[in-house]
Amino acid sequence: MRHLLSTKTLAREDAIRLLDVAEDMADVQGREVKKLPALRGKTVVNLFFEDSTRTRISFEAAAKRLSADVITFSAKGSSVSKGESLKDTAQTLAAMGADAVVVRHHSSGAPQTLAASGWIDARIVNAGDGTHEHPTQALLDAFTMRRRLHGRGSRGRDLDGVAVTIVGDILHSRVARSNVWLLRTLGAAVTLVAPPTLLPVEVSGWPAAIGYDLDAALAADPDVVMMLRIQGERMNAAFFPTTREYSRRWGLDDERLARLRADSIVMHPGPMNRGLEISAAAADSPRSTVREQVASGVSVRMAALYLLLSGDREA
């Protein structure tokens, strides 16, 4: 594995290997000294063209816990805001000796361009590109599911037979796209639920069932319910009548939460719009994995950086 750009092209064995290495990294986080010397002497650049809190901090923590040198680059206040191209930025990073570049970009396909261009000889990790993909978010979601379902015996396990329902703004969600492909690769059955206006045209070609009625989807007794944020910043039109109407029809409120099995899992990639797509009670319930997902993110990103920069030496 030279780059981590997409879950659509990620092989099953590579996905399970990464999740297993993430288990080892999670064990490290349980120690008093949460650090390994694995990437000492390596330089990891976080190249963020979009605002981010969770993902950026998570990648910073992951690289530092592997003893890498970390450079964080924000487009705001940089030469990019003055018109510098992605090519020129990449060549600048190459001159600085970057070994890995974690890139978040508003344009779909930007990380793939960076990886294939020859502008920089570094491992590329996609930290979210437009509405295309967000592979490490899907991996940390799968890691969290696997731990909840299989506990300490999760190493080497897939998600065969697990029913996952993803609800909300599918149209603008790179998280949904990455999850659909990865979960299918790991054997899960995925159902997407959204108003028709928030489903992309190409969704009919995805390996997932499509529904428009959340109550009907919950009646099918899914193992996992993943709620997605309404991405108002990407909307330039009315995709539903009102937020109240959206919440009434597609929000995970207290009454719908009460219908779920006691051992079901409620997920949200964050940030949450409490009271819109998910109630406070659902977000804070014992079924919720929201905080676990944040912790899992560091472990999964440690595993990704380790495998890209040192873990494949044995392969």
Curated annotation (Swiss-Prot):
Enzyme Commission numbers on file: 2.1.3.2
Keyword Flavoprotein: no
Positions of carbamoyl phosphate binding: 54-55, 104, 134, 137, 270-271
Any single Gene Ontology cellular-component annotation: cytosol
Keywords: Pyrimidine biosynthesis, Transferase
UniProt KW Ribosomal protein keyword: no
Listed GO MF terms: amino acid binding; aspartate carbamoyltransferase activity
One Pfam assignment: OTCace
Catalytic activity, as annotated: carbamoyl phosphate + L-aspartate = N-carbamoyl-L-aspartate + phosphate + H(+)
Alphabetical GO biological process terms: 'de novo' pyrimidine nucleobase biosynthetic process; 'de novo' UMP biosynthetic process; amino acid metabolic process
Pathway note: Pyrimidine metabolism; UMP biosynthesis via de novo pathway; (S)-dihydroorotate from bicarbonate: step 2/3
Residues that coordinate or bind L-aspartate: 82, 174, 229
Stated family: Belongs to the aspartate/ornithine carbamoyltransferase superfamily. ATCase family.
Oligomeric and partner information: Heterododecamer (2C3:3R2) of six catalytic PyrB chains organized as two trimers (C3), and six regulatory PyrI chains organized as three dimers (R2).
Function: Catalyzes the condensation of carbamoyl phosphate and aspartate to form carbamoyl aspartate and inorganic phosphate, the committed step in the de novo pyrimidine nucleotide biosynthesis pathway.
HAMAP family from the UniProt entry: Asp_carb_tr
Designated name of the protein: Aspartate carbamoyltransferase catalytic subunit
Organism in which the protein naturally occurs: Leifsonia xyli subsp. xyli (strain CTCB07)
